[in-house]
A protein has these predicted regions:
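Glycine-enriched alpha-helix->loop->beta-strand junction motifs that scaffold or abut catalytic
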Residues: 217-219, 245-251
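Non-cysteine beta-strand/loop elements that form the S-adenosyl-L-methionine
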Residues: 141-161, 249-251
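Divalent metal-binding segments
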Residues: 1-132, 151, 156-208, 229
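Short helix-capping segments at alpha-helix termini
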Residues: 106-112, 138-139, 219-227
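Conserved helix-loop functional segments at active or binding sites
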Residues: 191, 214-222
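Catalytic cores of alpha/beta
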Residues: 241-243
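Aromatic- and carboxylate-enriched substrate-binding clefts and catalytic-loop regions
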Residues: 228-239
């Protein structure tokens, strides 16, 4: 029986040998192998997310049921609006099915809560495909709105995967994990700006923030983007230089 236990932060997990064997069979395994410890079963960052690739993907009807159930529970607590980043949250990671579910519920008047979607993608090609299919920040129905593109640039402090400029004191030589290279980030920010898409990037460590600030500064289309300011989510380990850089780039 495959078993996986995910840390509360979602950035590190551990699975048994049966789970590892299944994980090694997915097409994306070569991309995430460096984040998998085959001796201990420890998974980090992207490897944590791809475990869901071995689980059965829900149908659109099931996805719609999940959304309606969650909305009902939020309504019971008095909530009328919510933001979330659902597109990579379910087995199969079928963002098209999740978007179709929200749009169908909204069209039928069955969304009981206003939903603002942070469009989370783990791979640059998926983020670009989303935009190329016509989605843009600010597109809205009655209760569903397309929000910013959400990227995860590093991990968490608890998992020692937040990207730092200096090594962790209790983990010599470890400066965390970067999801996108500087070249990839530069390309994505230019693509977002050229196609009128806002970006919100998860950054816990100072190295991750430095990379996002650099990407924003390099974008040749930055002044053409009218969809709002790009943002850094969390900004946990920062300093005056980083804060000034955010101010300079209007983040």
């Amino acid at each position: 029986i495959p078993i996986i236990m995910v840390r509360v932060c979602g950035h590190v997990a551990v699975c048994n040998s049966c789970g590892l064997e299944l994980l090694k069979k997915i097409p994306e395994f070569p991309e995430i192998e460096k984040e998998v410890d085959l001796d201990t079963g420890l998974l980090k960052e992207n490897a944590v997310q791809f475990y869901s690739s071995v689980l059965e993907a829900p149908s659109q009807e099931e996805v719609e049921d999940y959304i309606k159930y969650s909305a009902k529970k939020l309504n019971e607590c008095g909530f009328t609006g919510v933001q979330s980043d659902d597109l990579a949250s379910l087995p199969g990671k079928n963002w098209r099915r999740i978007m179709a579910s929200y749009k169908a519920l909204d069209a039928r008047g069955e969304l009981s809560i206003r939903h603002y979607e942070q469009c989370l993608f783990e791979r640059a090609e998926d983020a670009k495909a989303f935009i190329e299919e016509g989605y843009r920040t600010g597109q809205r129905g009655d209760h569903f709105t397309v929000g910013p593109m959400k990227l995860i640039q590093d991990g968490s402090l608890g998992a020692r995967t937040a990207a730092m400029n200096e090594p962790y004191e209790d983990s010599p030589g470890n400066t965390g994990i970067i999801t996108f290279s500087q070249e990839e980030l530069d390309d994505l920010f230019a693509f977002f700006d050229r196609h009128q898409m806002q970006a919100a990037v998860h950054c816990i460590g100072d190295r991750a923030m430095d990379m996002v600030i650099e990407a924003a500064a390099k974008s040749p289309y930055r002044k053409d983007n009218k969809k709002g300011r790009h943002g850094i989510v969390h900004c946990q380990i920062t300093n005056p230089r980083i804060l000034q850089g955010m101010k300079d780039q209007d983040l």
